[in-house]
C-alpha cells in the first residue's frame, strides 16, 4: 500500500538533491535558457502567430524530452548507481512509494518549466493559460511514464542519459523530413507531435478533443510497457 508520508519524504529528498546533481540540473537550465533566447532574440514584436507557436512548440517538446523523460530516468538510475535503491526497497519504503516520489519530483520540474516558458514567450493573448496547462501537463505525464521505463533498464545515470539521447534525436529529427509518408504517419500519433498540433489549434481557437485522446493513449501505452518491464525486472 502507498504511504503518503513516505512519498512526501522521498519527494522532499529529491527536490533538495536535484541542485547537486548535474545530470538533472542541466535539463531545466538548458530549456529555460533556450526559451529565453527564442523569446528575447528570435521573436520580433510583429512576429506572426505561426512563428511564435512554432518556436513555442519546439521548446515545449524539448522540455518534455529533457525534463520529463531524462530526469525521470536519471532519478531511478541514480539510486541504482549509489546502491541506495536496495536499501530503500528492503526498508519500509515500497517500490510504488519510490516511483511515486520520483514521478512527483519530475512532474513538478517539468510543469514549472512549462509555466515559465509560457510567460517567457508572452503568449497570454494567443494561448489561454488553462488550455496550455492542460496540454503540456498531459504531455509531461506521458513523457515521464516513458522515461520511467528507461530508468528501469539503465544501470546508472550515464547509461540512462545514453539511452535517452538517441530517442530524443528520433523525436526531434523526424520533423525535418516532412513529406515521407511513413515518417509522417508514425510521427503523427506520437505525443510530442500531438502537443505541437494541439498548441497550434489552441492558438487558432479550435482545439480538437482528438489531441487529448491521442496523448492519453500514448500515456496508456507507455504505462503498459513500463508495467511489463517492472514485472520482469523490478527496480533493483
Which role fits each region the language model picked out?
Residues 1-24:
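N-terminal Sec/SRP start-transfer signal
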Residues 17-43, 55-71, 163-176, 214-223:
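Hydrophobic alpha-helical transmembrane segments of multi-pass membrane transport/permease proteins
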Residues 52-90, 94-117:
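Hydrophobic alpha-helical transmembrane segments of multi-pass membrane transport proteins
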Residues 216-236:
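Junction motif at the cytosolic side of a transmembrane helix
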Amino acid at each position: 500500500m502507498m504511504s503518503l508520508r513516505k512519498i512526501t519524504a522521498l519527494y522532499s529528498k529529491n527536490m533538495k538533491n536535484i541542485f547537486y546533481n548535474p545530470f538533472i540540473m542541466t535539463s531545466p537550465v538548458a530549456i529555460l535558457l533556450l526559451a529565453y533566447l527564442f523569446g528575447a532574440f528570435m521573436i520580433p514584436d510583429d512576429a506572426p502567430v505561426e512563428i511564435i507557436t512554432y518556436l513555442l512548440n519546439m521548446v515545449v517538446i524539448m522540455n518534455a524530452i529533457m525534463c520529463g523523460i531524462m530526469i525521470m530516468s536519471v532519478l531511478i538510475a541514480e539510486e541504482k548507481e549509489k546502491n541506495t535503491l536496495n536499501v530503500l526497497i528492503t526498508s519500509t519504503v515500497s517500490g510504488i512509494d519510490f516511483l511515486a516520489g520520483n514521478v512527483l519530483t519530475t512532474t513538478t520540474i517539468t510543469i514549472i518549466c512549462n509555466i515559465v516558458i509560457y510567460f517567457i514567450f508572452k503568449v497570454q493573448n494567443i494561448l489561454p493559460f488553462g488550455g496550455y496547462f492542460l496540454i503540456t501537463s498531459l504531455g509531461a505525464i506521458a513523457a515521464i511514464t516513458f522515461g520511467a521505463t528507461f530508468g528501469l533498464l539503465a544501470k546508472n545515470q550515464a547509461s540512462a542519459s545514453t539511452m535517452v539521447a538517441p530517442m530524443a534525436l528520433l523525436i526531434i529529427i523526424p520533423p525535418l523530413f516532412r513529406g515521407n509518408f511513413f515518417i509522417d504517419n508514425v510521427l503523427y500519433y506520437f505525443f510530442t507531435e500531438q502537443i505541437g498540433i494541439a498548441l497550434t489549434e489552441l492558438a487558432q481557437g479550435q482545439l480538437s478533443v482528438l489531441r487529448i485522446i491521442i496523448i492519453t493513449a500514448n500515456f496508456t501505452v507507455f504505462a503498459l510497457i513500463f508495467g511489463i518491464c517492472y514485472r520482469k525486472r523490478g527496480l533493483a
